[in-house]
A protein has these predicted regions:
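Glycine-rich phosphate-binding loops that contact phosphosugars or nucleotide phosphates
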Residues: 20-153, 157-159, 244-271
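Acidic, glycine-rich catalytic loops of TOPRIM or P-loop NTPase phosphate-binding modules used
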Residues: 50-58, 70, 218-229, 238
Length: 311
């Protein structure tokens, strides 16, 4: 935590000498982009004067935003050295922005090109409170604290001590649910995954990384708020649907979908962050920002149990 604080302090100090922070850009591909989305969500809803954008790495390279300059901070993420993301860091450096490379260890190709490097725990035995999602949130809470004197900074920092136990407890207590999901969905070939707000990146990860990439199962990513603008027309018997429900200010979107599914769907699973009592355990002002930190490991656990069921 101290390392992240020092990095943000130095990076912001450099930008302050150039006129002050203008914007924060988040750049990555695939699961890494899903992992850094919580940082963007946090700044979007809590920062008063810090605009953000998120880019696929190659799009950032080939359609570089004209607004990018030496007053911008670019946060890039890749476990090792995804070629497009390495090029994105180089592009940001070339333009004069300050870059933070998030990566799996200090010796990766990403670490070699970032002006600052933040490493994160990874792999099957990772410490989730030190994983990529947790670390990007540390960076962004620091930005909020140092630039706008964020009033809930201490509450956010205290929340990290609870994360690993919450995830371990959910895997233990929800094993019967995961097993029931596995038996009910193991033969499905198409999934509709819904989420919004702090769980939009979680839904992206479940679709693209855990179902399509790892299980070779077709899946469609649908924003809970967009569900009623076309996708709901396919809801019916036998359609495999997973709704990821968040806590916080966008929960209304998920609850509206839930009411519809309860009425018209017969093959839907709900994974609800509220059942984990996150506001009580993490703090009512910051819990929603940690939703994805907790829920990506849980949805992946569901898919993993289903993979075991399939053999």
């Amino acid at each position: 935590m101290e390392n992240v604080r020092n990095i943000v302090t130095e990076a912001l100090g450099k930008i302050k000498e150039r006129g002050g922070l203008k914007a924060v850009y988040f750049v990555a591909c695939g699961g890494s982009q899903a992992a850094i989305y919580p940082g963007k969500y946090l700044l979007d809803v809590e920062a008063k004067n810090i605009p953000t954008k998120i880019y696929n790495s190659n799009e950032f390279v080939y359609a570089t935003p004209a607004s990018l300059d030496e007053r911008c901070l670019v946060i890039c993420c890749s476990l090792k050295a995804t070629a497009e993301t390495v090029e994105a860091v180089k592009k940001a450096n070339e333009i004069g922005a300050v870059t933070i490379a998030m990566t799996g260890n200090p010796e990766t190709g990403m670490a070699k090109v970032g002006q600052y490097v933040v490493t994160y725990s990874n792999g099957n035995d990772q410490i989730y409170s030190l994983g990529n999602q947790a670390q990007v949130l540390r960076i962004c809470f620091e930005i909020l604290h140092q630039v706008e004197d964020y009033p809930y900074y201490d509450e956010a920092m205290a929340a990290y001590a609870q994360i690993d136990e919450i995830i371990a407890g959910a895997k233990r207590d929800w094993l019967p649910r995961a097993q029931a999901f596995a038996k009910a969905y193991k033969d499905d070939t198409m999934f509709y995954i819904l989420g919004a707000g702090p769980l939009w990146g979680t839904a992206y990860s479940m679709v693209n990384c855990h179902l399509i990439e790892m299980q070779q199962r077709n899946a469609c990513l649908i924003h809970s708020g967009e569900y009623f603008h076309g996708p709901f027309e396919t809801t019916g018997k036998g359609v495999a649907i997973v709704l990821l429900m968040s806590t916080g200010r966008t929960r209304f979107l998920d609850e509206r979908v839930l009411r519809f599914l309860n009425k018209y769907a017969d093959h839907a699973t709900i994974i609800d962050a509220a059942e984990l009592k996150l506001e009580e355990r993490l703090g009512k002002h910051v819990a929603e920002f940690f939703n994805s930190v907790v829920m990506i490991p849980i949805e992946r656990y569901y898919v993993s149990v289903m993979a075991d069921e399939r053999g």
